[in-house]
């Protein structure tokens, strides 16, 4: 029996799309790889512009090869020209030249922009050149909708030492005021053994989001910052409001850590893995408004 060849046209259902501008992580735990995995897990189509190729695994960075700034800009333009992007996130931008070209591409674009100011890897390798910090602060952060620094990054941006929750609150407010943007200061690097608390400051909203701190195998926390900022961009692309998107992003990271999978060859080594039920972890977040 022959199958009939029917010439039919189907209008595909629209899906939200996000763009990540970041470095490639050969180990798969962070960078572009983590971003695209996070987009997909949350029902968002992912596009990308690669800024650098890193040779790394969850425990060490062996090498960083930055792309030419023009090559990064061309990737961004190619995506924005024809694809209906709903939100953008940036990660590792590495050099002043790349930062300036990315800023030129994004200035005309009126979309939610999540900036993860990546400076140092989990293993301690510098992922931003010294002269790039000034370009980040002068040319790029003014474009951000959200900035998502960890504690060491927030100390550099705010010019403050963070040793307590009140220090974190002061730093978040200072960053938000300086760049007129939302700030989520991530508390994963804090010294507390019990809780991981993030400070959220945006348009008069000030609160903390706290969860019990998980004690996990080596390598598991690699890529948490990338995953958080990508999840935030994904939920913004889907139209969630600010607080809903932030809470969902934190829940996604918590779930990814709690449901980590073993990937090591000859040692205990684990990596984050997207959670099956996000709502399970949203219920574990304590929200304190101030």
Predicted regions located by residue number:
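Conserved phosphate/ATP/ADP-binding segment of small-molecule kinases
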Residues: 130-206
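Phosphate-handling active-site elements
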Residues: 42-47, 206-207, 235-249
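Short, well-structured alpha-helical segments that form the helix of a local strand-helix-strand
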Residues: 168-176, 210, 241-257
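Acidic-glycine-rich active-site phosphate/pyrophosphate-binding loop
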Residues: 5-15, 31, 194-211
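Short, small-residue alpha-helix embedded
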Residues: 38, 155-156, 218-242
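Conserved N-terminal subdomain of the carbohydrate kinase-like
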Residues: 2-20, 36-123, 275-278, 287
């Amino acid at each position: 029996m022959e199958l009939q060849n029917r010439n039919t046209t189907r209008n595909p259902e629209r899906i939200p799309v996000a763009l990540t501008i970041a470095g490639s992580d050969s180990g798969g735990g962070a960078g572009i790889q983590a971003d695209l995995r996070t987009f997909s897990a949350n029902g968002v189509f992912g596009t990308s512009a690669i800024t650098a190729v890193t040779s790394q695994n969850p425990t060490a960075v062996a090498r960083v090869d930055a792309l030419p700034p023009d090559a990064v800009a061309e990737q961004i333009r190619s995506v924005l020209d024809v694809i209906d992007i709903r939100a953008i996130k940036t990660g590792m931008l590495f050099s002043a030249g790349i930062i300036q070209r990315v800023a030129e591409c994004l200035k005309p674009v009126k979309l939610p922009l999540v900036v993860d100011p990546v400076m140092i890897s989990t293993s301690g390798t510098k992922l931003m050149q010294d002269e790039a910090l000034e370009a980040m602060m002068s040319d790029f952060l003014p474009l951000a909708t959200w900035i998502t620094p960890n504690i060491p990054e927030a100390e550099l941006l705010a010019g403050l030492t963070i040793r307590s929750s009140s220090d974190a609150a002061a730093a978040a407010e200072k960053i938000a005021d300086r760049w007129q943007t939302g700030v989520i200061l991530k508390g994963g690097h804090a010294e507390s053994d019990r809780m991981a608390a993030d400070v959220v400051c945006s348009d008069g909203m000030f609160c903390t989001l706290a969860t019990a701190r998980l004690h996990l195998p080596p390598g598991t926390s690699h890529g948490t910052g990338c995953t958080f900022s990508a999840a935030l961009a994904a939920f913004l692309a889907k139209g969630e409001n600010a607080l809903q998107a932030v809470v969902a992003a934190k829940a996604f990271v918590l779930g990814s850590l709690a449901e980590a999978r073993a990937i090591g060859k000859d040692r205990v080594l684990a990596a984050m893995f997207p959670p099956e039920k996000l709502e399970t972890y949203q219920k574990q977040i304590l929200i304190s408004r101030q």
